[in-house]
Swiss-Prot record:
Protein name, UniProt field: Secreted RxLR effector protein 122
Compartments, record wording: Secreted; Host nucleus
Keyword check for Secreted: yes
Biased composition (Low complexity): 280-290
Gene: RXLR122
Length: 352
C-alpha cells in the first residue's frame, strides 16, 4: 500500500513541475514536515495570488503544493477502503465458486416425479390416506339450539343401491365391532357419503352429516320415550339440554365409529365406481374377487337348484331389523341348513 502512495505522490509532483515550467517558475523543494504550515499559509492568500499570477512567483508554488498535499491525503484515506472492498469482492466470488451445485440428474428426476404426480387422477386415494373423524369430539348444544325444529336431511333410500346393498351390508357387518350393529339403512347412508360417482365431500361436511344423523336419532328417541320426556319437562332447561346432549353424543360417537370403519374399508366394500357399475350389471370374472361378490345375496333359509349339486349352508348369524325404529335386534342363534340345492341369484346365473 505504501508503494502506491509514493507512486501517486511522484505523479503529482511531476505534474506540478510541468505546470511550473510552463509558467516560467521553478518548483521549490517539497517537505512533508511543512505541509501543514504551507497549507495554512495558502488558505490566507488573496484571490490575486491564484494560479496564473506572475507578480508573486513564490506564492504560486506554495498554493500548488498545498492543493496537491490535500489531494494526496484524501487519496491515501480512500486507498485502504478500496482495498477492503476489492478483498471482499474476491471472498464473495470464491464463496460462490465453492457453493455445491445440484446435479442435473437430480433436477431431471424431481421434474419427472412432479410430472408423474400431476398426471395421477385425484380420486386414486387409498384407504391408508383416509384420516377419519376423531371419536373424542363432543357436540355441546345449548337448549336454545335444541328448542328449534331440527330439519331432516335428504338421505337416499336404500333402494338407490338395492342391487348391491345386501352384499355391501353383509361385508360391512363383518368388519364392524359387535356393539355397533349397523343396519341396512345406515349402510346406505354411509355408502352415499363415500360414493365417488358423485362430487366428493370434505371431512367437515361428512361430520356435519353424521351430526345430523345423530340429531334425527335423538328426535326418534324423543317420540319413543314419551313417559321419560314427561318427567324431563318438569326439569329445568339446562338439565334438559344436558340430557339431549348426552344422547346426541352417544349416537354421534356410534356414527363416527361406523364412518371411520367404512372409510378404512371402502375399497373392499364399494370399490371404485367402475367396479360398482360392473357389479350392478352382473359381470363375472375378476370382479367376483371384490367384497360385492364375496357376499352373495342369498337368503339363509332359501334352497334351490344348481345343476343337481348340493351344498351345505355355512354358519351365519341372522339379524332382524325393525323397519320403524331402524335399530338392530340381538342376533338369533346360528342356523345350520341341511344339505340342499342352491340357486344363484339373478344376474349371476351360469350360462348353460
Amino acid at each position: 500500500m505504501r508503494g502506491a502512495y509514493y507512486v501517486l505522490i511522484a505523479l503529482l509532483v511531476v505534474a506540478s513541475s510541468q505546470t511550473s515550467a510552463e509558467s516560467g517558475h521553478q518548483l521549490q523543494v517539497y517537505d512533508h514536515d511543512f505541509v501543514a504550515a504551507d497549507t495554512a499559509a495558502a488558505t490566507t492568500l488573496p484571490r490575486q495570488f491564484l494560479r496564473g499570477s506572475r507578480n508573486v512567483p513564490g506564492d504560486l508554488a506554495h498554493e500548488e503544493r498545498a492543493i496537491t498535499s490535500e489531494l494526496v491525503e484524501e487519496g491515501a484515506k480512500l486507498i485502504p477502503r478500496a482495498a477492503e472492498n476489492v478483498e471482499e469482492i474476491s471472498r464473495v466470488a470464491e464463496a460462490v465458486g465453492k457453493r455445491p451445485r445440484v446435479a442435473e440428474e437430480d433436477v431431471l428426476n424431481k421434474a419427472s416425479g412432479a410430472n408423474e404426480a400431476f398426471k395421477k387422477p385425484r380420486n386414486t386415494a387409498t384407504d391408508d390416506a383416509f384420516q377419519g373423524i376423531s371419536t373424542e369430539q363432543l357436540l355441546p348444544l345449548s337448549y336454545k339450539q335444541w328448542d328449534t325444529e331440527i330439519k331432516s336431511m335428504r338421505i337416499p333410500k336404500p333402494e338407490k343401491y338395492q342391487n348391491n346393498i345386501q352384499s355391501v351390508y353383509d361385508a360391512f357387518v363383518d368388519v364392524c365391532d359387535e356393539d355397533l350393529k349397523p343396519t341396512i339403512s345406515e349402510t346406505a347412508r354411509l355408502w352415499n357419503l363415500f360414493d365417488r360417482s358423485f362430487k366428493p365431500l370434505t371431512t367437515r361436511l361428512h361430520q356435519q352429516a353424521l351430526a345430523q344423523f345423530a340429531k334425527e336419532y335423538v328426535l326418534r328417541d324423543e317420540l319413543r320415550l314419551k313417559t321419560e320426556w314427561a318427567r324431563m319437562n318438569e326439569r329445568t332447561m339446562p338439565n334438559r339440554a344436558g340430557m339431549l346432549n348426552m344422547k346426541l353424543n352417544w349416537h354421534f360417537q356410534r356414527w363416527v365409529r361406523m364412518y371411520n370403519k367404512f372409510g378404512e374399508r371402502r375399497s373392499e366394500l364399494i370399490g371404485t365406481p367402475l367396479n360398482v357399475a360392473r357389479s350392478r350389471g352382473g359381470t363375472t370374472g375378476a370382479s367376483r374377487g371384490t367384497a360385492l361378490h364375496r357376499h352373495s345375496i342369498v337368503p339363509l333359509n332359501a334352497a334351490s337348484t344348481s345343476k343337481g349339486k348340493s351344498s351345505v349352508f355355512t354358519e351365519r348369524s341372522q339379524r332382524t331389523f325393525d323397519d320403524n325404529t331402524d335399530i338392530a335386534s340381538p342376533p338369533s342363534k346360528h342356523i345350520k341348513g341341511q344339505s340342499s340345492e342352491l340357486v344363484e341369484p339373478e344376474g349371476h346365473r351360469s350360462k348353460p
